[in-house]
């Protein structure tokens, strides 16, 4: 649960920093001294980031799709089932995450018999929706 709180805090911080930087209309100071960090760090522009929270009922899933700038999924509740084209199905539990590289065709959703709440972080760009995931594909056959 602690890991979920940390991941949720990170996602919310990214969304908040996107808003604050955009509202200020000022680029962050490169390499500014900050007593909370050791070494040079830079707050990067997050204007294209988006964070969404979605609930999937047991067995619900997306169609095959890709994101032209990638996607990060975080499991808040339940279990997530995902598959990247040409790879085996993978399941993740609470506090675990999965990154999908740009333009990689994949699907994700809840496992059979258990609901899922996921956070998805988008990096801008577009989603290309493809065909539905069949029951056989969902079951790994």
Question: Residue ranges of each PLM-predicted region?
Answer:
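Glycine- and acidic-residue-biased ligand/ion/polar-headgroup-sensing regions
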Residues: 68-86
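Ligand-binding loop in jelly-roll beta-barrel domains
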Residues: 102-128
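A short, N-terminal "cap"/entry segment at the start of jelly-roll beta-barrel domains
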Residues: 2-53, 63, 91, 128-141
């Amino acid at each position: 649960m602690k890991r979920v709180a940390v991941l949720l805090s990170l996602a919310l911080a990214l969304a908040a920093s996107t808003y604050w930087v955009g509202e200020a209309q000022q680029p962050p100071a490169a390499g500014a001294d900050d007593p909370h960090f050791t070494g040079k760090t830079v707050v990067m522009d997050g204007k294209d980031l988006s964070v969404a929270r979605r609930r999937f009922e047991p067995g619900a899933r997306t169609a095959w799709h890709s994101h032209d700038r990638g996607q990060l999924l975080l499991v808040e509740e339940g279990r997530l089932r995902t598959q990247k084209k040409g790879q085996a199905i993978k399941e993740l539990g609470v506090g675990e995450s999965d990154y999908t590289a740009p333009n990689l065709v994949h699907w994700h959703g809840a496992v059979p018999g258990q609901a899922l709440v996921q956070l998805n972080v988008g990096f801008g760009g577009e989603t290309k929706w493809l065909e539905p995931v069949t029951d056989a594909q969902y079951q790994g056959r």
